[in-house]
């Protein structure tokens, strides 16, 4: 079964080159990708994820707001009755990883994460969610 991924930029971060590269590599790995574009809110991401019936949400975070915005996306999904897992890629300091996981983020990809590692991790996250 093809994995469906929604990728989004939440908040005011206008840098989209990285998320477009990630979207392409996920497509090349056989995943179906929905890109919501820039300047999304946790609410719009959650609604789109549910409407698109995706298996996982990927957030690109470069603005330093990851400890605020990523948990808000997770909370909004849960409030809407969805258990879609959320993964985050971008600039996330190592000392924030535990807080991200505690907030319900399933995986975090920092600078230098390889395409193979991202694909393998997303496959694993989705496999756990489908089990």
Question: Where on the chain are the PLM-derived regions?
Answer:
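N-terminal pre-triad scaffold of radical SAM enzymes
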Residues: 8-12
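Cofactor-cradling patches in redox/metallo enzymes
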Residues: 19-123, 127-128
């Amino acid at each position: 079964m093809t994995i469906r991924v929604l990728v989004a930029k939440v908040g005011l971060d206008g840098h989209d080159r990285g998320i477009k590269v990630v979207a392409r590599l996920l497509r090349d790995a056989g995943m179906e990708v929905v890109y919501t574009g820039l300047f999304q809110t946790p609410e719009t991401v959650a609604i789109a994820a549910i409407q698109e019936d995706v298996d996982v949400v990927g957030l690109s975070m470069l603005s330093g707001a990851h400890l605020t915005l990523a948990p808000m996306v997770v909370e909004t999904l849960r409030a809407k009755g969805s258990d879609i897992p959320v993964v985050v890629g971008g600039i996330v300091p190592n000392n924030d990883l535990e807080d991200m996981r505690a907030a319900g983020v399933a995986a975090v990809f920092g600078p230098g994460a390889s395409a193979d590692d991202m694909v393998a991790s997303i496959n694993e996250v989705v496999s756990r969610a489908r089990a």
